[in-house]
Amino acid sequence: MNLEFKRKLPTPQTVKDMYPVTEELARQKLENDRQIKAVITGEDQRLMLLIGPCSADREDAVLEYAARLRTLQERVKDTILIVPRIYSNKPRTTGDGYKGMLHQPDPNGQPDMLKGLIAIRKMHMKVLEQTGFSSADELLYPENYYYLSDILSYAAIGARSVEDQQHRLIASGLDVPVGMKNPTSGDLSVMMNSILAAQHPHTFLFSQWEVHSKGNPLAHAILRGSVNKYGRSLPNYHYEDLSQLYELYAKSALANPAVIIDTNHSNSGKRWEQQARIAKEVLHSTRHNGDIGRMVKGLMIESYLLDGCQKPDGGVYGLSITDPCIGWEKTEQLVLELAELRG
């Protein structure tokens, strides 16, 4: 067997007991949950922005970024609901490269999953303590969600995981919104089937238990573009793409038809500077068609303190070490413009 069992890690409950959430923070998290759920169900008409760095590489820069988001949130609170995107694990196309703070709490150090679990919990907790935001993170490893389940308000399932049965089943047992990205192939039926699976109850094996999920009516779509057989990026944020998704929802029996548009990845062709243009085009589509306007609940934007990216050992504070992001000045300008368009 080509597998070495290095050490047994503490259970999610043990880590939660080591780093507990106070009653005040628990109440704040529940209020954040309520607002985010209200956007997904349509009770709250604000536009949700899932916004933050491609990967949360260092706690200090993430905390500064989140603090700036809090100040910005107060300026746009009537039309925009901000949810920090704080991704602590990073899927890799080939399996190589920096895999996120969970794997490497020090980007230049060796993998250490125990230190990583503690580091990501402490980081998410500090964001909640210092800014009042409970964050979004990617559900890359389904079993790891429960280390953070009391401090996250949104989970995303990525393009490479959306066909996986365990991801779908775990999503059906979460009590927060879960966004299902379309697969890299662009096949929307795969995404819609994932949403259907997540919205239904299931009995399955998890962490040495037979468990039963109740179904998650807040599971919804994320459009992130696709890649064709020649490796070319194909966007799916245009008006006709949104119309097609609306028709798929209309033919389904899914609860809470909703979509978040990812403005980067294959939608931008990895041209990160195009995110502002894409975001504004999506909002124009929502204004021209009421059905699309009701379906589009928000945008996912990759943003950090500085424009662009660097290698993992670059050492520049607030500059992404994975995919390039728009910097703070562009971020602030974009959010204010979106608030004006939304108003």
Question: Could you say what each language-model-derived stretch is?
Answer:
Residues 1-41:
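N- or domain-start disorder-to-order transition segments that initiate the globular core
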Residues 52, 261, 327:
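Conserved, mostly hydrophobic/aromatic
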Residues 304-342:
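Internal helix-turn-beta structural module
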Residues 7, 66, 79-244, 265-281, ...:
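Active-site-facing alpha/beta catalytic cores
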Residues 48-61, 323:
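Conserved phosphate/anionic-ligand binding catalytic regions in large, soluble enzymes, centered on
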Residues 37-45, 251-256:
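Glycine-rich phosphate/diphosphate-binding loops that line cofactor/substrate pockets in enzymes
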Residues 245-250:
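Redox- and metal-dependent alpha/beta enzyme cores, enriched for Fe-S-associated oxidoreductases
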